Structure formats: C-alpha cells, structure tokens
Amino acid sequence: MCSAAGASKLSDPNSINFRGGDNTAEWDDTYRSLLGCPVTNLTRDQFRQAARKRGSGWEMYTYGAHKTLFWLFAVEYATLNSQKSFNAQKDANGFSQGGLGLGPTQMTDWVNFNNSNPLIPCGYTNEFGNSSGEKAYVVKNSSDGTHATLMANRYRGIENPFGHIWKYTDGANIQVTTGDAGLSILWTTDDPSNFSDTSYTGYDKKGNICRTLGYAKKMLLGEDGDIVATEIGGSSSTYWCDYYYTHTSNNRMQVVRVGGDASSGSAAGLAVGGTNYVPSDAYRNFGSRLCFFPKYKSTEITTTTE
C-alpha cells in the first residue's frame, strides 16, 4: 500500500506526502530515504481504514485476493515453487517456465541498516507493465557504495508479490486455543462488511490448520483452495516450497500474513504463511496492498472502535 491517498497519481514520488515505512522524516534525501516507499508499521485496522478512504469498493489486501494470485501463478507456471529462477522465454510449447526468481529476499543486516523499513520505492518495476519480470535494485550505503542487491520482481503487473515486506491480509482470521485439546482454526470471508479484528461472525469455518512451524507439506485446500498449512515436512524446493509460521501459546485471534520479507531468503514465496501475529501488531516490515472490488462498490461499511 502506498503511503498516502492519491497514490494512483504518484507524479512526485519524492514528495513528503508519499513518505512510507515508519515515516522517519530525518532520512529524507539520504541513502535511507523512505520517500516513495510503501507504508508500514500500521495495525491491520489502520490499513483497512486507510484503504477505505479512497471510497466504496476499496479495501486493503485480502486473503482471497492473495489466494487467487497464488493459483493464477501456479497454473501459469505449472509449479508451486514461486522462487524458481525467472525465465522470460516460453518453453517449446509456448508456456511459461521457471518462476519469479528469489525476489527481494536477500537483505543483510536489515535491522541495523534502517530498522527493517522498506527498501524499494513503489513502481520500481513499472517498465514491465502488466507482464512479469525481475530487476536488480541496489541498496546503497552511507558512502554511496553497495550494501545489498535485491531482485525486485513483478507478476502480471503486481510488484514484489512476495518478499520485501510482509503483507497483512484481511478476510482471514485464525482462532487459536491452547492446551492439549487446543486447535488453530481458519475462518474466512470475502465480504468486506464482515471484516473484523474481534469477531468470527459472517466468516466461514474452513478447518483446522497446522500448529507447528516449518516448511509446508500439505495445505488445507478444500473446495476453495485454501493455502494455509495443515502439515509441515517440506523444504524450500519440495512440496509447497515455502515456510509456515504459527503461534499456539495464547488463546486469541491471529491474522494471516503472506509473502515473507527482505530477509526471508528461501523461506519466502507466494505460499508462505504467517499466522503468528495478532491484528493489533504493527511493525516496520509489515505492510499491505490496495485493492478494488467492484462487486462491493455499493456496499455500505460501518465500523466501531472497541
């Protein structure tokens, strides 16, 4: 999600109106500038409300939207491993091959560099338009040397679909209970009027998910193709090829984050799932996306603060 309303007309990405990350102003015009970068360090509801300021039908990134994106990629490239090397050439039958590359996942010493704030400005891969591709982004240090080189990627017009910063999703909640009989249950909805950080009302109960972290071996799937792990035991190159994070020590509602971040390495990808944080968490490496859903354009959405 870009850092201010009107991002669709990003005529001057270096304007202070488009300062992203945690909004550190003293970094403007330095090697750590956050101007033009995606906004982070907000709670899920803050992302939700920011998206809705654009008007009816606008929402933050949803679990349903990401799930659709994953399956479009999997069908087009005939692989579950989104981090396979990018290959711009079609195979002998005219089909896409390879994957989307490592993505921006190889950042070193990120915390000390800029407190794990975003690194790549929005629109860096716009030259690919609605196509797919990857492009090296050089992270400069204080002496204008190279601190790290990240591979920004794009899938069908969507920039950095994984890596760089974690993406908060709406429309999916995890109900966690503790103890020997404890469960972690996935609840989802596509209806923005039901989106909530405190209730499962209006959500569909999808099933029990994995309570141990590791590389995903099996996903919940079902008739809706849910991509939250039910079993671990894979690796970065087998089964679902991405990591699964969870937390089971507290009775609480948890969220679904996707994609991994700039330091995730081979654990990142389109199928990585982070179900270990709560809706009120806000971190410099947590962001989201802006989505428009024409079906819900006329939906009247009201929220209450509790």
Tell what function each PLM region has:
Residues M1-P161:
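Short aromatic-cysteine micro-motif
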Residues P13, D22, E26, K53, ...:
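Alpha-helical structural elements
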Residues Q49, G64-K67, W71, D91-E134, ...:
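C-terminal, surface-exposed recognition/capping segments
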Residues N81-K84, T177-G179, L290, T305:
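Residue-level detector of alpha-helical recognition elements and their boundaries
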Residues Q175-T189:
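A short, polar/charged loop-to-alpha-helix boundary motif
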